[in-house]
Amino acid sequence: MSTHAGSMGLDSRKMAFWAFIGSECLLFASLISTYLVYKGKSLNGPYPHEILNIPFTSFSTFDLLMSSLAMVLALSAIQRGDMRQGKRWLFVTALLGLIFLGGQVWEFNHFAHQGLGLTTNLFGSTFYVLTGTHGAHVTVGVTWLLTLWVQALRGKLGPAQAMTVEIAGLYWHFVDVVWIVIFTVVYLIQ
């Protein structure tokens, strides 16, 4: 039986993943900083206050927050060996992620019909790069969650693999926290 514990008793996979999350923090910090530097500097519209739909995006944000709760419930169930609930909550987490992505696609399409493209103005460029990068990360997370769900359905995921689920949960929670920052900076602070 192999162990992943390092010299300090910490799981090396988890430590490596925290290092990865640190690099992801730098990526999103640079994208958010770029958005803030260019905020309000677009010479032509549409401008954020003309097209951002805060109630719609608030619902999407709530959806993503509920997916974090579902992820906690999935991990807890798997750690307890309750695979029926573990499978259910993994699927719910992925489904909520897909709903969030559907909202992003709808929003991007809506903005495009209102004349906001990637090259329309500085707002469009920074908005689409920031939220698109986040959406790509959510897509990776949903794919990871669905992979874990399929493994669970096939009986290849159980309490012995709980660390794998925990690491996926770290990623998922990170993506959620990043969205809270994006939502606050882009949508709420005008």
Locations of regions flagged by a protein language model:
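...captures the hydrophobic TM-helix bundle architecture rather than a specific catalytic motif
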Residues: M1-Q190
